[in-house]
Amino acid sequence: MKTKRSSTLVALASLVAVVATHVAVAATINVLADGVGGCKLRDAIRAANTNTAYMNCTAGAGTDTLVLQQNDGKPVFSAGQAATADEDDNFTGDLDITSAIIIQGTNPEQTIIVGHDFDRTFDVRPGGSLTLNDVTVIGGSVVGGTANDGGVVRKNAGATLTINRSVLRDGTADLGGAVYATGTGVLTLDKVSIFDNSANFGGGIALTQPSGIEAVLNNLTISGNIANVTAGGLYAQGWFRLRNSTVTNNKSVGVGGVQYGLSGNTTGVNFANSVLVGNANGNGDPSDLYCSGSTGNNQLGSRAFTMIGAVVNCTFASTSGNPTSSDARLSPLFDFGSGRPTHALLAGSAALNAGNPSNSNALLACLSSDARGVSRSTSCDIGAYEQKIDVTVNSFNDFPDLNPGDGVCQAQGNTCTLRALTMEASASGGRWFVNLPSGTYFLNRNLNPNNDPDGGDIDVRREEHDNPLQLTLMGAGDADATRIVSTVADRVLEVRGREGTGPGFDFVHYPLAFALFNATLSGGALVVDPFEVDPNGHLDGGGIKITGGSTLFYNVVIKDNVVAAEPPGDNAYAGGVFVDTRSRNFSNSNLPYAAESRFERFAVIDNTVVYPGGYNVFAGGVFATGPSTFDEASDGFSMVNGTIADNQSQLYGGGAMLYGIFSASFVSIVGNSSGPLNPPGFTQYAGGLTAGGQDNFVRNLLIAGNLAGIEPSDCETSEFNSSLVSLGHNLIESPGDTCAISGDTSTNLLNVDPELGPRQVSAGMPFHSPGSNSPAVDAIPVSACDDVGGFAVQLDATGAARRSEANPACDIGAVEAVELPIFVDGFDP
């Protein structure tokens, strides 16, 4: 009997062991991108949910890991079948998660999940658990539906959701444009960038979880989100802990930033080492944190080492170490490393080294790394971004790198030159945040036809998909303190994130992000370009040429450059800046690495394009050819707070010629000319701005004093059915009969003299100021002092405040009006 019982126990124990072993085994399912045969994302989720093989996907088991296989040319994984009915079994519409699933990407640049226009992207059902790592999720819309919350992802009651090192963008919902979490089950977001989402409540995130269920929000960037009712950034009716996060540039009719939406005191809402500034309500007023409770019923938990600009109706049970200044000095949103856009901290930011120096309380201490994965110092910078200089250029010489690709900037004499640095970064890839000390960097190495980076212009490119390049050059101080000057026959700078492969314009894109701060580029003289790779290429960009990639130029001047098309040369484009942000066309993959370029606080002046060989020339200042409507995730070319002045084209287009998707806010296009050597009627296109296409938007734009030949010519729309889409408050002195303007034209000032003064310089930035009696002065009400996206523009091109409490209205154009200085010698600056 004992023997029999013992045998039975042994058998049962063995069976339990087998079952336990079976349960512990988890499946790995390889998922292939769109355009590649094999297991697809929706099918893989079904196989994981049901533990049954489905279509081309192997069966799931336990906590399944879905590995999104990297495909360099086709990085998109779409949600697949569009919604046809409201169902929760993952057949159509959103991707329903009913089991424990990990979705693993390569990085946000190379793994892109695209949602539907008529449903969210992910729905984590009760009992389900989703961990989402290293991806970008674009889109998802549930506005107007019966369960209209969570545009990108929804966590239901009884579910858990964890998102790490990812990007959530372009979602639309009633509650939570990107993320909505409700009921029991933990929400954890770490190193996530949430931007360009919209909702009625909680443009970025909405939480309606019961007391005691704390949402863990670490290293978040919540930026550029909009709420139609309230809480552009985060709306919470529940507990959350926000640590080392940045909430900025969000907007709502009600509260711009964060709103705690319950009445009553709570210990469950806590802030540590974070930044909440630069958010605005519908009146354009600062609005960063608001509590819905009445006086005495509006106390939150702790605020430690946290910068909050405008706090309304909130108190805290405990406070410690909070900065006295709210001057965060944030950069525009950009990829400064990791593929997750953040806001860098610029010189003088009150957020630098403002974090908790103690780790005695783990919940109030600095996190060990920032949103990009950069290690934090003991007294960290507050917000999602930790400033860290990777390399300092320590020589003004123009020596090349000795061994590109070894990860070390090393030129002759054991120095790190600007040329060596860009050669090494381009060859090695990865994150490079570079200090560029003030002074003049002369480019004096002649063009080497056998080795492009070795001579001529500075070249930034990454011709590999692995280890994407994110390079930031940070000049010192004013825009003219750090100068890059070419003394040879080439442009000054070329940034290339795209190659052309044939006459069909099939583009090959590489994930590349380049930013330049605080610099003046001059002296470019482009007469030949043996390295042109795009079909039908020309001589493009005397100062800067940008082809593909993601680029940011902030507090930068491009001046005194020239393009000359000499025989047997080709057409010449853009004496100053040439930008090509085309990402795709009919023949290549859907949604590749979207190219976009942003110029903010800039000047393009005194550049020239000529044709001594008799060839066509276009655009003395700026020429941009942008993406079309086939590009789902590109902003094309955008300009904010800039001056394009005194540029000259010997034939066509004086100031700027812009095609495709572009936008311009607070830009002055002044005193440019086209065709000055030709008789009247011979020149084509405007002396000021020539625009083509319908996907363009202009706001608070000033165009005046430009010439085509000898005739006033400020604006022309040059393509059939094209127009400038006005968002209001544009001043054009001489629009003529060929400048079609659509959109909101009610506040535009046409055929009006802005009464500009002569060119001045402040903080190294050239500009033309309107006179004190100019119709451009105070023409914009505070609620419209925005860019084309509807977000408040705080500074002008020189860094001066756009508005003040005494005078909240803004001026049209690049700068707020200033008095013209009088010098004893009688000369203007």
What are these regions (language model features)?
Residues 56-62, 429-430, 569-571, 615-616, ...:
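Short helix-terminating capping/connector loops at secondary-structure junctions
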Residues 160-162, 181-344, 361, 388, ...:
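Predominantly extracellular beta-rich ligand-binding scaffolds that present long acidic/polar faces
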